[in-house]
Each structure stands twice: as C-alpha cells, then as structure tokens.
C-alpha cells in the first residue's frame, strides 16, 4: 500500500481506490511532463488519459465513502473504461464533448453527492478539492494576465499546476497518519 493509515479505518476497497489514485497522480506528472516537452495532440493524449484516471478514482472514492463500497466498486469498474474512452474519442474525431462532460459533469456529480448524501465514514476532503480545482481552472483561464500582473514571474498555467498539487495534499489530509 502507498497509504497506510493507523488512525482512520480504511476498508480494503477504499484502500485499493486510494492507491490507484496515487498512481494516477504520478501518471499525471509523467503525462503532463511529456506533453510540455513536446506540446502536440499526440502528447496531449497522455496528459488527458492520466487526468481521466484521476477523475475516475475521485468519483469512485466519493461513491465509496458517501454511498456504499459496492457503489464505489461499480463506479470504478464503469469509469475505468469509459473515462479513458473520452480521450480516445477526442483523439479519433476531435470531439472534446465526452471529455468535457466527464470533467465538468463529474464536478457537478461531486457537488450533488456532497449536498444530497450523509457522511457514512471518514473520507478525503472533496469540498476543498472542488474549490481548488475551480481556482486552478481560473488560473489557467487567466494565464497571460497572471503572467503580466506577476511581472513575468509566474504564469497562470504554472500556478494551475501548483494549485492542483496543493489540492491533492488537502484532499487526502483527513486521512493522514499521525
């Protein structure tokens, strides 16, 4: 296990999803690095594939802790195939709609689940993840303005990556080993 928690009881199914989440975070670093070395549609596939895996594992963790372990497993089983397929569709025909639906529909699904379900067991901090994801997207959107306002010190795109890293740390912080 990448993550062993002595203070919060983590089920085996949640532990599997959490470990896959950590692996996908590593894959994001590799995919993003590959893309930034040679920005083109081919290398972007690897960046986006890793992102779809992160979305998958976040939604599976949410279902696991807020609905049921079985629901978490079914979410994982379905999205592990469907999520990467959204990138392959985009790569094949240029249609980014399925990927956008996964990304932004997933955010809506997280928000609705947080609002409409009770906490069944301790889990990661989904609220901070959503907030920081929104802030990261804003940083990306205002990339050039941030770069100019910072007197060419940092771009919005770079800030997006730093905020995303912070989001992961805060997301898992309720599960930390003390």
Feature map (PLM): residue ranges:
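Multi-pass alpha-helical transmembrane bundles in non-GPCR membrane proteins
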Residues: 1-178
């Amino acid at each position: 296990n990448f993550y062993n928690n002595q203070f919060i009881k983590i089920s085996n199914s949640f532990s599997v999803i959490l470990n896959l989440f950590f692996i996908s975070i590593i894959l994001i670093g590799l995919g993003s690095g590959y893309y930034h070395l040679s920005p083109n549609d081919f290398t972007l596939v690897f960046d986006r594939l890793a992102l779809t895996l992160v979305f998958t594992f976040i939604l599976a963790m949410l279902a696991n802790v807020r609905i049921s372990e079985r629901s978490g497993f079914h979410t994982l089983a379905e999205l592990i195939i469907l999520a990467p397929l959204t990138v392959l569709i985009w790569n094949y025909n240029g249609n980014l709609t399925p990927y956008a639906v996964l990304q932004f529909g997933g955010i809506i699904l997280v928000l609705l689940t947080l609002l409409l379900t009770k906490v069944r067991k301790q889990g990661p901090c989904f609220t901070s993840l959503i907030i920081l994801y929104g802030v990261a997207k804003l940083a990306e959107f205002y990339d050039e303005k941030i770069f100019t306002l910072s007197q060419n010190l940092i771009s919005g795109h770079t800030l997006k990556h730093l905020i995303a890293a912070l989001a992961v740390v805060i997301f898992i912080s309720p599960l930390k080993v003390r």
